[in-house]
Amino acid sequence: MEVEVGQIVNTHGIKGEVKVKSNSDFTETRFQPGEQLLVKHNNTEIVYTVASYRIHKGFHMLRFEGINNINEIEHLKGDYIYQERDHQDIELGEHEYYYSDIIGCTVFKDDDTPIGRVINIFETGANDVWVVKGEKEYLIPYIEDVVKDIDIETKTIKITPMEGLLD
């Protein structure tokens, strides 16, 4: 199964480098030279092999093998990038999940009151933070004191909110 790992938001320079906004976990592994990525463009799937990878101003900068000119890649602006979900170099530990497993889950308080759906995840130094959209937008830290249960099969998450978390 494939998971979405990013979107090509622009080109960079004239030698065929693309600027990618990642919406995935494990980007340091997924975007390494030699990795294969699938780009879906106009109902066509194109497989590219990463030739180079670097981070520049918060974006992931990629060059693909065989692409040496902006004209060969410019038409992919706005397209999404995918990769096999179960990457051979990624091992999940206990209580670790793929972003794609968490995004879309419905979050409930421990009394079964629905709060909203996880729409985004961002990394902080200490822990991930889930953006949950309900009546308002809430920032839920992925920490043991708050997140009590995650059921990937039913796409549900139970939390015990800290005081002020949902205000």
Swiss-Prot record:
Keywords: Chaperone, Cytoplasm, Ribosome biogenesis, rRNA processing. Its main location: cytoplasm. It is found in: Cytoplasm. The keyword rRNA processing applies. InterPro entries: PRC_barrel-like_sf, PRC_RimM, RimM, RimM_N, RimM_N_sf, Transl_B-barrel_sf. GO terms for biological process: ribosomal small subunit biogenesis; rRNA processing. One of its GO terms (molecular function) is ribosome binding. GO terms for cellular component: cytoplasm; ribosome. Binds ribosomal protein uS19. An accessory protein needed during the final step in the assembly of 30S ribosomal subunit, possibly for assembly of the head region. Essential for efficient processing of 16S rRNA. May be needed both before and after RbfA during the maturation of 16S rRNA. It has affinity for free ribosomal 30S subunits but not for 70S ribosomes. This is Ribosome maturation factor RimM. It comes from Staphylococcus epidermidis (strain ATCC 12228 / FDA PCI 1200). The lineage of its organism: Bacteria, Bacillati, Bacillota, Bacilli, Bacillales.
